[in-house]
Swiss-Prot record:
Compartments where found: Golgi apparatus membrane
Keyword Cytoplasm recorded: no
Ranges where the record places region Disordered: 229-345
Keywords noted in UniProt: Golgi apparatus, Membrane, Repeat
Domain called PDZ GRASP-type: residue spans: 27-112, 118-207
Pfam families found in the cross-reference section: GRASP55_65
Main localization (coarse): Golgi
The species this protein was found in: Schizosaccharomyces pombe (strain 972 / ATCC 24843) (Fission yeast)
Protein's recorded name: Uncharacterized protein C1D4.02c
GO terms, biological process: endoplasmic reticulum to Golgi vesicle-mediated transport; Golgi organization
Annotated stretches, region: GRASP: 27-223
Keyword Transmembrane: no
Signal peptide: none
Length: 345
């Protein structure tokens, strides 16, 4: 049994390893630069974060001549499948081009998996640390690269910091909430007054990959977070009450429709005043008392009519006939003919 279980685990491990190898071998043309006001720029293709993996549904194999041929044959419109490191999603981008027109971007064939893994999330930041002096924002900023060279592997950042102790280190920082990338310079130092060389916690792995960008930056102090469309937009001004308006007057009682009203269909609700109870169960409203008396009178009249109708029906109804006599057997000769006559009738 244990031998079969061992073989099963071995097969599953090999299958999972094959899946990981296939995912690691996924590649595409990485966008290194996008020219301003170009076709790629207007199509919102981002440098550093985007990989072109297919053209018109045809997967690319890293051959630049194949890529250029597909672009020439796609006139007047080409569809690019673009993989983004932000959220690890693939989108389709349509670009209208001519056969001899340039898209306006610089590409390099590269593997996607190492780029997805080369992300470090800035967690807690200690005050007066090298990272705090560089104005890094905790839980919003991500280290995505450096001009010093490629960063691959989980220990790439720590090795880079160790090699730049007491020296300026340039880093590319991506802010998730503002969807912007900036370059900062920090000086790693183990004698700045706290733990570590840069003074912050760093997260790495699947849980700390680049998320998809938000629709906009987070609200700042004084910004309108929620608005009521009934107020006419954010420019609507609310008047401030004066000191005399802080106390509201007593509102008028509401009005209800009356079914018995003649010329007017509205009557005001009567105001009741609290009095001492004269006896238990006393009714304060005369209109309610008259209504109850009228209902009691109608109930008595209806009950009286019902009794009269039942007595009349009893007098006019024909009584039921009595049951027939029961024949009795006897040895007396005089009663025998009478019994026989009753049976014949």
């Amino acid at each position: 049994m244990f031998g079969g279980l061992k073989n099963f685990i071995k097969e599953k491990s090999e299958a999972l390893a094959g899946i990981h190898r296939e995912s690691d071998e996924s590649c595409g043309f990485r966008v290194l630069k996008v020219e301003n006001d170009s076709k790629a720029y207007n199509a919102r293709i981002e440098s550093y974060y985007d990989f072109i993996t297919a053209v018109n549904g045809i997967l690319l194999n890293g051959d630049p001549s194949m890529f250029m041929a597909l672009l020439r044959d796609s006139s007047p419109e080409v569809t690019l499948e673009v993989f983004s490191l932000k959220g690890q999603i693939t989108r389709k981008v349509n670009i209208k081009i001519n056969s001899d027109e340039k898209i306006g971007m610089v590409l390099q064939w590269a593997s996607i998996a190492p780029a997805v893994d080369a992300i470090w999330h800035i967690l807690n930041v200690i005050d007066d640390s090298p990272v705090a002096r560089a104005s890094l924002v905790p839980y919003e900023d991500y280290i995505v690269g450096t001009p010093e060279g490629m960063m691959t592997g989980e220990k790439a950042l720590s090795d880079l910091i160790e090699s730049h102790l007491n020296r300026p280190l340039r880093l590319y920082i991506y802010n998730h909430y503002r969807d912007s990338t900036r370059q900062v310079t920090i000086v790693p130092n183990r004698h700045w007054g706290g733990n570590g060389a840069i003074g912050c916690g760093v997260g790495h792995g699947v849980l700390h990959r680049l998320p998809a960008p938000l629709s906009g930056p987070p609200p700042q102090p004084g910004d309108i977070v929620f608005s009521n469309p009934m107020l006419g937009g954010p420019d609507h001004k609310v008047s401030q009450p004066s000191e005399t308006e802080n106390f509201l007057p007593t509102p008028e009682p509401p009005k209800i429709a009356s079914a018995n009203a003649g010329s007017s269909n509205e009557i005001s609700i009567p105001h009741y005043q609290r009095h001492k109870k004269s006896h238990k169960g006393a009714i304060q409203d005369s209109s309610i008392q008259s209504y109850l008396d009228e209902e009691e009178k109608l109930s008595r009249e209806l009950d009286h009519k019902t009794k009269d109708a039942s007595s009349t029906n009893d007098s006019q109804t024909t009584p039921l006939p009595p049951p027939p006599p029961v024949a009795v057997n006897s040895t007396n000769d005089e009663s025998a003919p009478q019994n026989e006559e009753l049976v014949k009738n």
